[in-house]
């Protein structure tokens, strides 16, 4: 019988990341875990709908037995069974992030007995979670280099607070892992600006694009008008394609915040990324930790190791026999498997 791993949900960033990573790793390794103080420091502590959906999705895919799977719970016991490939559908029932639920369960399906398809309904454009286009255009090409083949499709947008979006991913079992080396991003090839609108006047998008174009040389400027019933909502994105990596940054528009201010937030974030020679942006960095650990080798550079990144590394090291090394050189942090 495998030992029970005890986790403190208040450690590190103290949010849902610890729980999501633990669920993924428990499903993969077969190790049960107990987590306490789930999101204890948040305004609404304990499990929200998004986290509860991730727990139930993980339990269904690996036939786990679970204690504490209810809204507001700050303690959870998860005992996994065998991971089964297949077709799955999960509904969050709010504007909670579809992609965060997907990212919880997909790693386990890399080791399933056959191909799988997972569809999640909920929020797709959430200020605190990656949109589907980030997964599709940034993360999945890098996963493919590691030997992980999955394809994410955005079927319907769902903005906060209404939700109603749908995202699906098809995934195949991994045959073998490769080593990812991302020391330098290389020269910029092109930059693309994109605005999504649903039930919002077109002039908002035009002003946002104009703000981006005032700071960067954009090779593409795209405005996409979505059906009104998918909103109201607005997201501004800027994609930076370099020789070795494509990064994508986004900001979700807010009521009573001008188009110029929304776009200026994005400009600031992209400039911060470009000011450093590091290959990987802050959010992508913590998404690479688990696949790199499973491969047993690899490295990337990031400007600043975020609390999310350090928390993710700490959880991975509890479940897998790997150790990460972080070395700062000339203002850039090199993250590697030791």
From Swiss-Prot:
Any Pfam family hit: RTC_insert
S-S bonds: none
NCBIfam families recorded: PRK04204.1-2, PRK04204.1-3, RNA_3prim_cycl
Domain of life: Bacteria
Gene that this polypeptide is encoded by: rtcA
Family: Belongs to the RNA 3'-terminal cyclase family. Type 1 subfamily.
Protein name: RNA 3'-terminal phosphate cyclase
Reactions accelerated catalytically: a 3'-end 3'-phospho-ribonucleotide-RNA + ATP = a 3'-end 2',3'-cyclophospho-ribonucleotide-RNA + AMP + diphosphate
Annotated Gene Ontology cellular component terms: cytoplasm
């Amino acid at each position: 019988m495998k030992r029970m791993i005890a986790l403190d949900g208040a450690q590190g960033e103290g949010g849902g990341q610890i729980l999501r990573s633990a669920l993924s790793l428990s499903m993969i390794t077969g190790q049960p875990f107990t987590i306490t103080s789930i999101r204890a420091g948040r305004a609404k502590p304990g499990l929200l709908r998004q986290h509860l959906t991730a727990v139930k999705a993980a339990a269904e895919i690996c036939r786990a037995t679970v204690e504490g799977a209810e809204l507001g719970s700050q303690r959870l016991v998860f005992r996994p069974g065998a991971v089964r490939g297949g077709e799955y559908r999960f509904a969050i029932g709010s504007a909670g992030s579809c992609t965060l639920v997907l990212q919880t369960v997909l790693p386990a399906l890399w080791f399933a007995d056959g191909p799988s398809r997972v569809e999640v309904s909920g929020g797709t454009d959430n200020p605190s979670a990656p949109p589907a286009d980030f997964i599709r255009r940034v993360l999945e090409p890098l996963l493919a280099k590691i030997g992980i083949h999955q394809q994410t499709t955005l079927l319907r947008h769902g903005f906060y607070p209404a939700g109603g979006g749908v995202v699906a991913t098809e995934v195949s079992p991994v045959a073998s892992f490769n080593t990812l080396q991302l020391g330098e991003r290389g020269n910029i090839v092109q930059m693309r600006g994109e605005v999504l609108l649903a039930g919002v006047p077109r002039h908002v998008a035009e002003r946002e694009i104009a703000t981006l174009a005032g700071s960067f040389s954009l090779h593409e400027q795209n405005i996409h008008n979505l059906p009104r019933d998918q909103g109201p909502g607005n997201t501004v994105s800027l994609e930076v394609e370099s020789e070795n990596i494509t990064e994508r940054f986004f900001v979700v528009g807010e009521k009573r915040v001008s188009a110029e201010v929304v776009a200026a937030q994005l400009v600031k974030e992209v400039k911060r990324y470009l000011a450093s020679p590091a290959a990987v942006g802050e959010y992508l960095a913590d998404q690479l930790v688990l696949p790199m650990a499973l491969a047993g080798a690899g490295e990337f550079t990031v400007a600043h190791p975020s609390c999310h990144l350090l928390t993710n590394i700490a959880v991975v090291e509890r479940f897998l026999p790997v150790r990460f090394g972080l070395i700062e050189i000339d203002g850039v942090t090199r993250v590697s498997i030791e």
